[in-house]
Design a protein with these regions (language model features):
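A taxonomically broad motif for mature regions of secreted/extracellular
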Residues: 25-191
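Fungal secretory targeting signals
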Residues: 1-38
């Protein structure tokens, strides 16, 4: 009986050690699961959709035989509305979010493409209709682009500088010639 008591006490001791080891906290594994579910993907989707929608409207305008302002005004107003809606959607995200570098690069590419599309549209409108005819539309386009860039700079710190680097071939003189003065100020380009 004495041997049975010793064996059971040893078994209970081993069992208590196993309970102790199971109760110890374990280190969490290194995973990036939360990084993929952040607001960076939402921002990327907004910018990609913006580029797609603006490109579709610019293509529609390119296929129109421009003779008078009324031919193009509805389509330019639609572009202004698309950019404004995207800018308002961007500002609803958190301020100064941290996103991956590859997502940030994709966002910069989309925004730079939107700026290029709008600048090319402005150049086309001025060439075909004249500055005095489309000046009101140019000012509206300038305001909506300024809103987009300002809201992007609120959400992602330093993104405006990356956009400037990507649109370096569009000089400040071109932006000034198409009357996008507010964009010049936001982008920090000298005349």
């Amino acid at each position: 009986m004495l041997a049975f008591g010793r064996i059971t006490s040893i078994l209970f001791f081993v069992l208590s050690l196993s309970f102790l080891t199971c109760a110890l906290p374990t280190p969490a594994g290194q995973t990036n699961a939360l990084a993929a579910r952040g607001t960076g993907a939402d921002l990327l989707k907004i910018c990609a959709d913006l580029e797609t929608n603006v490109k579709a409207k610019v293509d529609v305008i390119a296929n129109i035989d421009l003779k008078v302002l009324a031919d193009v005004e509805v389509h330019v107003e639609a572009i202004i509305e698309i950019v404004t809606i995207a800018a308002k959607a961007i500002v609803t995200l958190d301020a100064h979010i941290e996103i991956d570098a590859d997502i940030k690069a994709q966002i910069v590419v989309h925004v730079a493409a939107v700026i290029r599309l709008i600048v090319n549209l402005c150049v086309t409108l001025i060439a075909k209709l004249g500055v005095s005819v489309v000046l009101a539309l140019l000012v509206k386009l300038d305001v909506c682009l300024q809103l987009l860039l300002a809201n992007l700079s609120i959400v992602i710190e330093g993104i405006v500088g990356l956009v400037v680097n990507l649109i370096a071939d569009i000089t400040a003189k071109v932006l000034a010639n198409v009357h996008l003065d507010l964009c010049l100020k936001v982008l920090g380009l000298p005349l």
